[in-house]
Amino acid sequence: MAEEQVLNTHNASILLSAANKSHYPKDDLPEIALAGRSNVGKSSFINTILGRKNLARTSSKPGKTQLLNFFNIDDKLRFVDVPGYGYAKVSKSERAKWGKMIEEYLTSRDNLRAVVSLVDLRHAPSKEDIQMYDFLKYYDIPVIVVATKADKIPRGKWNKHESVVKKALNFDNSDTFIVFSSVERIGIDDSWDAILEQV
């Protein structure tokens, strides 16, 4: 899919929620997974780049997404929202279950083209952020790192924060790094360019 205009990004809907591979859609549409810590702004990212207010439900309570949520975009592409990691109020067994579900999807889904790994630009990546990035690199899954909440930092400090994030991740410069803000609508075009390059 070389041209963005062939995709009507506003024609989007939630397709289904899945707990395991028996529930995944049975076709060959390309999929982009979205991964990140609870409350990093995954739902806001989805809503913003699709130009929709409440397609992905945002929540002030982290850990709301407990299944893989598949979003259909113009019958040409899917986003797959995976459960947010690193939320302390979820039991260890529940976290292990989520981890297994995410790992099964990421390592066995032929439709998967890339993962948008969301991190918070304001802070150094967490241990879980680093583990996720390392996991994706190990399995040779293309990664698009999107650093959210840029509006909370003065623009003059973005480069410094970007350097901190990249250093902690041991960022591979062949991957894409995007500074993003759903509030100020920064990084939308760059995100689409990176996504469409993979599908």
From Swiss-Prot:
Keywords: Cell cycle, Cell division, GTP-binding, Magnesium, Metal-binding, Nucleotide-binding, Septation. It comes from the Bacteria. Residues 28-199 form the EngB-type G domain. Belongs to the TRAFAC class TrmE-Era-EngA-EngB-Septin-like GTPase superfamily. EngB GTPase family. It comes from Streptococcus pyogenes serotype M28 (strain MGAS6180). This is Probable GTP-binding protein EngB. It holds the Pfam family MMR_HSR1. One of its GO terms (biological process) is division septum assembly. The gene is engB. InterPro entries: G_ENGB_dom, GTP-bd, GTP-bd_ribosome_bio_YsxC, P-loop_NTPase, Small_GTP-bd. Disulfide bonds: none annotated. Necessary for normal cell division and for the maintenance of normal septation. GTP binds at residues 36-43, 63-67, 81-84, 148-151, 180-182. GO terms for cellular component: cytosol. One of its GO terms (molecular function) is GTP binding. Mg(2+) binds at residues 43, 65. Its cofactor is Mg(2+).
